[in-house]
Amino acid sequence: MTVTTKQEWYLEYDITINRPGLLGDVSSLLGMMGINIVTINGIEEGRRGLLIKTDNLEKVKRFESIVHEIDDITITKLREPELRDRLAVRHGRYIEQDATDKKTFRFEREDLGLLVDFMAELFKENEHKLIGIRGMPRVGKTESIVAASVCAHKRWLFISSTLIKQTVRSSLIKGEYDADHVYIIDGAVTARESNQKHQDLVKEVMKLPSIKVVEHPDLFVETSEYEMRDFDYIIELRENKDQEIQY
């Protein structure tokens, strides 16, 4: 028996004429063409996003050509889904991404659920990543990292931290060296720590083929051999969009 592999696509469209039954008509058209809807959600005002699945790219192209003749909707995106697309359908909004620095993403405290989901998806990819997270004290940085680790079924280890009490590790035991762990470094604590054993441990951890999350990355790079360009992702977390992150 031959099993046909189906591929997912992300479809997003603007609603130009918001009439009753529009969503049903779009769904019916997809079904008639043999395209399955995996997930659907409103993406901000007047826009919908769908994850669709089909075994034939030609079906997607035919759907697109038919929709071009319809005045009610305008397709804005039709592509293989990116992580931001999947999260947008899941949460009903896009993550804010810096216009010039594409590896920088911005969140507000009310977006903690979206932030945790975003980081958890990054953690699940099971490959080396260096992630920096900026934010003022008590905005939810550490809690978000821990929550994302739990969601991704990863064990987390504090190399340096101020959560509950100040933690400064100078060594790890055998079971704590694991590519499946998430290592958390408070860049502010590490930057002012004079214990050479701690600094040596940080260098060792940074070379591990695992996920490292550095809080206050700007302070971390000031006293280390690393630069901001070494980070794969930079996350900024604020109480509100107007809050300035200052050190």
Model-derived segments and their meaning:
Residues 23, 60, 141-142, 220-223:
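Short, well-ordered alpha-helical microsegments
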Residues 38, 49-51, 129-131, 179-186, ...:
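Hydrophobic beta-strand segments of well-ordered beta-sheets in folded domains
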Residues 1-113, 121:
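A conserved regulatory-domain signal marking ACT and ACT-like small-molecule sensing domains
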Residues 127-160:
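Glycine-rich phosphate-binding P-loop
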Residues 156-218:
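Conserved nucleotide-sensing/catalytic segment adjacent to the nucleotide-binding pocket
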